[in-house]
Each structure stands twice: as C-alpha cells, then as structure tokens.
Amino acid sequence: MAHVVVLGAGLGGAIMAYELKDQLRPEDTVTVVTKDPTYHFVPSNPWIAVGWRDRADITVDLAPVMQKKGIGFVPVAAEKLLPEENRIALVDGKSVTYDHLVIATGPELAFDEVPGLGPHGGFTQSICHIDHAEAAKSVFEKLVANPGPVVIGAAQGASCFGPAYEFLFIVETALRRAKVRDRVPMTFVTPEPYIGHLGLDGVGDTKGLLESQMREKHIKWMTNTRVKRVEDG
C-alpha cells in the first residue's frame, strides 16, 4: 500500500490526481493538498477577459468531486517540504506524510523582472490567473468604450506562447463584434524568432498560417523583442 500526495490542484495537479486514482492499485491512496479549494479551468481565462465566460462557468468546488473519486483532499497551503521525512508541513501547523510526492504547484509569475509589467502595480494585464482575467475584463470594457491602440504578446522568459496568440485573436474578434475594431490598432510583441515559433521551432506551417491570419486581420507584429520596461499609456 502506498500513499501518493499531489501538491497543487490546478490544471496539472487535478488531472494527475484523477489519473493516479485510475491507474494505481486499489489499496493505494491519493491525497491532494492545495491552497485553493476551487479548480479554475485556466484555458478559458482568455474568454473571461472579454466577457465570453464568467467565473462560475469555469470553476469547480474541488471537495465534493475529489470525495466522489475517492481522493483525499486537504485545502490548506503548504509551508515547507521536508523530503528527508517524506512530509509536507502546512500553514495551519499540521502536516501530511507521503510515500510518493507529485509537485504540481504551477508557475511562479515573474512580473517583477520587468519594471511596469503585470496587473499588480504595473501597466499590463494578464490572463495567467482567473483573478487577472477578471481584472482584464474591466480594462477591455473601457477599451470598447474608448477605443485606442492595443499591444498583446509575451515577454522574454515565457515558455508557452500559444495562449498569447489565442488571446490576440479572441480580442480581435471581440472588438469586431463590438464594432470598434477599426479604431483599435493592434500589435503583437513576442521574443520568438519568428511568428508561430511557439517555443517549439514551429508546428507544421504555424509561421505561414499565423502570419497570413495576422495580415488578413491587419495585426502588426514584432519578433525577437526584449521588454525592458512598461510605461503607462
């Protein structure tokens, strides 16, 4: 009998817990430890930012679904890992022991590495978290009411570029539906060596396909960029 703990219950952690429960022996146990009792479907964050979805549409209360699956659930943040003891110390003073540990805590966003970057004290919006996406929605609504230039993209150090392109085309579509696209010049900025690189040296003809779509939709782009700082306006 083995006890497997999954630390984190986001897109990776929740799926991993389900997969483990399906594939491990009946006598093995799985426990999820997470600071957030609610699951957010991160791929839908771009839709939140333009009002195509609401928070309730993409969130799930984890406790009942984990219980139904026979997975232990501890909605308390971890404070410290003690690998020599096979133990996780929690912020409430308690701890969870394990035989095997899966760390799925997600990325640590590095907005502080670029002055002015990020939604917390900076001048850019984000769709990395549902809270960010909701804040971006209010900014998008202001844009519709008072159209002006928009820059969308990714900064150096990003490892996943697909969402930036997705958000670019979602915003373009939402602006057209709002009948203000003609008053919103759009520019895509990326550290990729070419459009459609995606951090993967391209996938098929992503370069040609994406460049074609961006030309058709009158979206300018800048590649091989490094963002030094972001200023208001």
Q: Can you describe what each PLM-predicted range is?
A:
Residues 2-72, 156-200:
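Beta1-alpha1 glycine-rich phosphate/pyrophosphate-binding loop at the start
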Residues 132-136, 167, 206, 210, ...:
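Internal, well-ordered alpha-helical segments in soluble enzyme and binding-protein domains
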Residues 71-166, 173-179:
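FAD-binding core/adjacent interface of flavoenzyme oxidoreductases
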Residues 197-202, 212-217:
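Glycine-rich phosphate/pyrophosphate-binding loop and the adjoining helix
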Residues 1-3, 146-147, 183, 224:
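Phosphate-coordination loops involved in phosphoryl transfer and adenosine-cofactor binding
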Residues 200-204, 226-227:
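Catalytic donor nucleotide-activated moiety binding site of glycosyltransferases and closely related
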Residues 57-64, 210-215, 222:
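Charged, low-complexity cytosolic intrinsically disordered regulatory segments
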